[in-house]
Amino acid sequence: MNFKEGEVLYFDKPLKWTSFAVVNKIRYHICRKLGVKKIKVGHAGTLDPLATGVMIICTGKATKRIEEFQYHTKEYIATLQLGATTPSFDLEKEIDATYPTEHITRELVEEALQRFIGRIEQIPPVFSACKVDGKRAYDLARKGEDVELKAKTLIIDEIELLECNLPEIKIRVVCSKGTYIRALARDIGEALNSGAHLTGLIRTRVGDVRLEDCLSVESFPEWLDQQEIEEVINE
C-alpha cells in the first residue's frame, strides 16, 4: 500500500464520533505507521455524530477523488419516532413539541412515503454544515440566531417501509448527494399531519461500497500492521 500515492479506505463510522474525528484517528495511525508528521487524509461525505455506517476515506493523491465519491448514490436505514419533534430533527436536541399519532396507520405511512420518491425540494436542517453568508448554519443556530436556508433539489430513488411499530417506523432510503435524512424525517412527520424525528441512522451503502466491506476504526491499527506498506521518501 502507498498512502502518499493514494489509497481509498472504507470504514463503519462509530456512534457519537464526528466524521472529522474519524479522519483524525486514521491520519494519526497512518502517520505513526509511516513515521511521518503529516499526510493528506479526507472523507467523502459527512455522517452526523448520531449516525453510523459507511464512510469513505481517501489518502494522499486519492483525496482528488473525494468529489467523485460524493456524487455516488447512498442508501440508509433510518428509524423515526412519530409524534414528536426536536430542533435538530434527531436525538442531539431534546423534544420541543408533541403531536397526535392516533390517526396514523400503516397504510397512511406507506402512502406518505410514496410522495417523496423522485425529484423533491428539501430545506436542510438549521443544525447542518450548510453555509449562510460564509458561516456554518449550525454555528449560527447554536448561538440562537435565526437561520433561513433555501430549499435544495435532490433525488430520492427508493423509500421502503421496513418496520411499522407505531409510533415508530423503520425505512430504507436510496438517495442522491445532499439528502438530509433528518430533514426527510421532519417532512414525513408533516406529511402525516404529525411530527417526527430521527432516532437511528445507518448508512448502509455508498455507490458499490457496502457496510460489510468496511473496517472498524478500532481494528484499523491491527489491520494496518498486516499490510505491506511502501516506504515514504520525504521530499
UniProtKB/Swiss-Prot annotation:
Its EC number is 5.4.99.25. GO terms for molecular function: RNA binding; tRNA pseudouridine(55) synthase activity. One of its GO terms (biological process) is mRNA pseudouridine synthesis. The active site is at residue 48. It is an enzyme of class 5 (isomerase). The keyword Isomerase applies. Gene3D superfamilies: Pseudouridine synthase. It catalyses: uridine(55) in tRNA = pseudouridine(55) in tRNA. It holds the Pfam family TruB_C_2. Belongs to the pseudouridine synthase TruB family. Type 1 subfamily. NCBIfam families: TruB. Responsible for synthesis of pseudouridine from uracil-55 in the psi GC loop of transfer RNAs. This is tRNA pseudouridine synthase B. The gene is truB.
